[in-house]
Curated annotation (Swiss-Prot):
This is Nucleoside diphosphate kinase. It catalyses: a 2'-deoxyribonucleoside 5'-diphosphate + ATP = a 2'-deoxyribonucleoside 5'-triphosphate + ADP; a ribonucleoside 5'-diphosphate + ATP = a ribonucleoside 5'-triphosphate + ADP. ATP binds at residues 11, 59, 87, 93, 104, 114. The lineage of its organism: Bacteria, Pseudomonadati, Pseudomonadota, Alphaproteobacteria, Rickettsiales. GO terms for molecular function: ATP binding; metal ion binding; nucleoside diphosphate kinase activity. SMART domains: NDK. Its EC number is 2.7.4.6. One of its GO terms (cellular component) is cytoplasm. Keywords: ATP-binding, Cytoplasm, Kinase, Magnesium, Metal-binding, Nucleotide metabolism, Nucleotide-binding, Phosphoprotein, Transferase. It is found in: Cytoplasm. Homotetramer. It comes from Wolbachia pipientis wMel.
Amino acid sequence: MAIERTLSILKPDAVKNNITGNINSYIEQSGLKITAQKMMLLTKKQAELFYEIHKDRPFFGELVEFMTSGSVVVQVLVGENAVSKYRQIMGATDPKQADKGTIRGDFADDISENRVHGSDSLENARKEIAFFFAECELV
């Protein structure tokens, strides 16, 4: 099994609703370790660059507005198959389709405010981690 890094973002709705500790518990109970973490307020430019892959999608403007509406917590998670493991504990993108026992299944109600972001591939995890963290911040 491969030890990997993945990026997690606890979105503004998670911070505003004070459930970051609950989400961190799900992460740690899965066997993943939080090795870097910081709270920040994304600028419009940062959100546009981070979600650039979605720039031609109809929800892009709403996504950028939401991601800049309040503080987020960005994290680096480390563990065996971290990318797929975190995607599994996040649950389906649409909380209505997410299983109970997943972050979205237990804490989210709406697809546009679904509490968390996680890298979808090892390659994207590397890019996303580098977007938010300098190499010297990584353990």
